[in-house]
Amino acid sequence: MSRRGPPISAFAALSSADDDEVIGYEQSDEDPESVSEQRPVSEPPELARAQPSAPVYSAPNAPVVVSCSKFVPTSENVVYGRGYVVIGLKADEFLMVKGQYTLKIQRGAVQIDSILYHSSHDPVKIYGLSLSSIPLISAAQVTDQNLVEDTVLPETEHLFTPNYKSVIRLDDVFDGLEKLGLLYPQLKNIHPNREDIDEFEGSAFAKSFYPYSFKVVENPSNNLGTYINKTWKNALEALTSPSGSAEDMRVLVIGAKNTGKSTFLRLLLNKLAAHEHISPKVLDIDPGQPEYSLPDCISLTTHHKPIHGQYFPFLCEHPARICYIGFNTPQRQPIKYISQLKALSSHMDMENGPLLINSPGWIKGFGVEILKELTDAVRPTHLVYLSFGGEDDNQLLCNLTYENLVRVPVPGFNSRGYDIVRYSPSQIRNFRMLSYFHYNRYEKTFDFEPLLARSPYKISYADFCDRDALIRYPGLSGISILDAANINHEDLVECLETQVVAIFELENEEFINLYDEMVQRGQLGSLESYPNLFNNTLESVAPEFRGLALIHSVNTTAKYINLYTPIDVARLSKSLASNETKLVLVKGRSDLPTEELIPKMISKTALPYVTYAAFGKGAKSVNVRRNVQRKTK
């Protein structure tokens, strides 16, 4: 089915584009003034039988909100160990576990957000953070006894009775991510158990989880669990039914903000990836809220197993195709964005497997132009439209190209009515940026000590533009600024310090082509003691994106740049030293939290001219107003 509507100019559409919706963080009762270090394991208290906990249900014709476990803790069905907890689940019981942990199924089977797992020795690692809906772990029926590998231990033998359907073990994962709040306090409550034990208010069961990296949410809370209603279940089953050809499926999920696009796509991804011989691909084209990409990037990734909880793209073992956009919105450079989008689309047919497309929550103005270009390039077999309903639906759909329409109605949802904590898009972007820069790829841990407390990497740069000399130079060849707007070369240092840049490698032949193009167009600028300035966005060549870096400072006397980056610097240095590739940095407008530049942990006293409460004048970026018409006198 192919439908068409009147064409929309990308530039004209910018004037009518939606503004980003910001959902502010609401302080909760779990928001203490200080964050303490992890305490050692203590003996668990004796648990009294509690009343059954139940999820919080909304009013009729509104979405169901699950904010806690459906589980009755007793001294029998919960076994505490050093670094782990074993829990027995009865039929119809489920757990909402907040925090980070590995899950092992010791008896029977469980469902994690509709994905069935049988007992096995293979652990499932889960980051159940409250940045998004928290996975639910439900007791489930075994479907194939050949898949069951029960583990009976003396301490849990009493759980292997007809009273219990499933037995699971949760193990600690203290990898440093739980200390994010020390650097960025706005997100300290995405992890549990950050309160001081002496000030902790809660039941004996809640206190028993204090030493662990996770906790079972026992009572109604301000967290949100993943709930799959009947409409979603039917849509997911229709898309993954055996009658269809999953290998050839291309699914585009669209909808306005807060309709659950990302959650629906994640559930569909998991259903497909749960099959042994299916490896779905995800085309993530939302640079503002990327689920499967690095900050300010779009990507094409392949997934071989389900994803439960928070996903970290830099932990992916399989290489991804990444395009650096440099901005958190396509509005900045719409033509470049669409060009990058088409470049990614051209690689889709090189790998087998279904394709799922994670689109921005932007279905008006320039967002329609993006979706139109995307559907023309991808030709989706299924268009999943999560809609609140309205007259604008048909106007949107008639502009898009697709074969089958799956319309999923979305009831209105207001998180404030349920005291659900929601974080703003900027806070989530800060989380992704901080977790990326503070990950140690060698130790496979996070370290949220301020970057300023570490020694940066040093890289020399060229301040000359002689062709032969530049080709032989083993350091930084030049810097490209995506929105340079005829920047003065003498102001380059001020434009670079404390800024996030992308690291690109070019094969020598590609660099020679780029050099010749820039010379011909007058795009190569050099100034003594300053890095070379490339007024070129590198679109005409094929550079390899290596990752992001934060520039600490520029030393114009010794001609080197200090920077921080989590990428494999040793491999990059070896490649440059052997003169196999050339190095170029590209700067966009990536945001960095103030806490990274001026961390609170440096001093307990107030810093002059610095505030963490609000932006000062001139702190926010200024956008050019478009279509401003003034009357002449």
Language model segments and positions:
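Short coil/turn segments at secondary-structure boundaries
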Residues: 115-117, 266, 294-296, 313, ...
